[in-house]
Amino acid sequence: MAVLPVVPGEQSFALGIYLLSFWHYCLYWMAFAFGVQSFGTFKRGAVIAKTVSVAALAIVYLRAPIDFASLAVIAAGILLNVRAAAVLGFDRTYYGHEVAGLPLRRVAVFPYSLTAHPMILGNVAAFGGTLINDAFRAQWWPLASLHVALNIGLLVMELAGTGRRRAVRIGGGVVLAGTLFAAVLAGLGTS
């Protein structure tokens, strides 16, 4: 019996990138909509899933020629995220109030002095910043656009709050199912 070597093609590479890219949004939604058994386990899973997602995006972004304007916007978004997370602390960054029952705490230090949702704005800037790079955008615009759309979805979820869990469960489920469908189509359609 002969064993044929499997050489992954560009289409299966793209499908893999898309399928690795969105799991952290699912974890956020599930925790927000249904709660968690262990906050520590949720945080670890969320960090691992987001790390895989960002690594997948970085792999394809770094294959494109350097675009300094794009890199500047990405860096600004990441710096906004880092500053916001540092101000909130690790537990509150991962829905500590909503999921783990940490007491409500109003934060008025930059960047929260300017906006209530700087991490989402930082994510939108960073993911949107990739689209400034023409070469990246030509092939991977659905990937970055889905990230931007899902971050806006997270904002809607956060604004709805835990008091509207049924709406969050239904709406989030529909959005995530649509995202999975769109990711598979985009991954299969990439040549």
Which role fits each region the language model picked out?
Residues 1-112, 121-191:
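Membrane-anchoring alpha-helices and their flanking helix-loop junctions
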